[in-house]
UniProtKB/Swiss-Prot annotation:
Ranges spanned by the short sequence motif Bipartite nuclear localization signal, renumbered to the chain: 1-24
Keyword match DNA-binding: yes
Alphabetized InterPro entries for the sequence: Gemcoat_MSV (IPR000143), GV_A/BR1_coat (IPR000263), Viral_coat (IPR029053)
Subcellular localization: Virion; Host nucleus
Swiss-Prot/TrEMBL GO biological process terms: symbiont entry into host cell; viral penetration into host nucleus
Gene3D superfamilies to which the protein is assigned, alphabetical: 2.60.120.20
Keyword DNA-binding appears in the UniProt entry: yes
Coiled-coil residues: none
Quaternary data: Homomultimer. Interacts with the movement protein. Binds to single-stranded and double-stranded viral DNA.
Organism annotation: Maize streak virus genotype C (isolate Set)
Keywords for the protein's UniProt record, in alphabetical order: Capsid protein, DNA-binding, Host nucleus, T=1 icosahedral capsid protein, Viral penetration into host nucleus, Virion, Virus entry into host cell
Region entry Disordered, spans: 1-39
GO cellular component labels: host cell; host cell nucleus; T=1 icosahedral viral capsid
Protein name per its UniProtKB record: Capsid protein
Length: 244
């Protein structure tokens, strides 16, 4: 082969190598591919001192999803809210009237969903329709059949309290010792997966009269007549959804 032909062949081979496509650079990931969910809002209801809860015979029913309209974390920002989780942390103390007797009772705490509150918070008897003979035995209460479409029990918890005929400030004689009893009870519960949807009227307050659909009540009833006070807090985790 002549020198000129060999030279042309070498040049052609070189050109083939130089014209090969280079590997393309990895493409940058487009931002916004995954949308982060907004964190839950939190509302805390504090009950201590003047705001402690007094639990009489027959129990008490309080609205807890009291989200007033506003811009703070504990306010609703839209016309609809979803309550996902609730935490209750309380200290129950038997009152002086109950401590006069030796007694034992099983109390109950409920979370009750009200589909159509109608402007006023119900009483425990409105929800459970118990006869007067069962007023002191809340473990026997059931939602009345006529209102089972309106009231839904989301959670139900039991607790036991005791009294021994003495109040907490009494002191035993020097030659005696008194065994402890459950006149003071710590009560802690946390629950999730509630999915309570609340539709609000076009008002700014967070009372039961502002709710069109979907109130959530904390209901507490003492057992066997051991009335008491509750000191602590309820914390609700929710989101503002729907239209402004």
């Amino acid at each position: 082969m002549s020198t000129s032909k060999r030279k042309r062949a070498d040049e052609a081979q070189w050109n083939k190598r130089s014209t090969k496509k280079k590997g393309s650079a990895p493409q940058a990931k487009k931002p916004g591919g995954k949308v982060e969910k907004p964190s839950l809002q939190i509302q805390t209801l504090l009950h201590s001192g003047d705001t402690m809860i007094t639990v009489p015979s027959g129990g008490v029913c309080d609205l807890i999803n009291t989200y007033a309209r506003g811009s703070d974390e504990g306010n609703r920002h839209t016309s609809e809210t979803l309550t996902y989780k609730v935490g209750v942390d309380y200290h129950f103390v038997a009152d002086a009237a109950s401590c006069k007797y030796s007694n034992r009772g099983t109390g109950v705490m409920w979370l009750v969903y009200d589909t159509t509150p109608g402007g006023n918070a119900p009483t425990t008897q409105d929800i459970f329709a118990y006869p007067s003979a069962l007023k002191a035995w809340p473990t026997t209460w059931k939602v009345s059949r006529e209102l089972c479409h309106r009231f839904v029990v989301k959670r139900r918890w039991l607790f036991t309290m005791e009294t021994d005929g003495r109040i907490g400030s009494d002191t035993p004689p020097s030659n005696q010792s008194w065994p402890p009893c459950k006149r003071n009870v710590d009560f802690h519960k946390f629950t999730s997966g509630l999915g309570v949807r609340t539709q609000w009227k076009n008002v700014t307050d967070g009372g039961v009269g502002a709710i069109q659909r979907g109130a959530l009540y904390l209901v507490i009833a003492p057992g066997n007549g051991i009335t008491f006070t509750a000191h602590g807090q309820t914390r609700l985790y929710f989101k503002s959804v729907g239209n402004q």
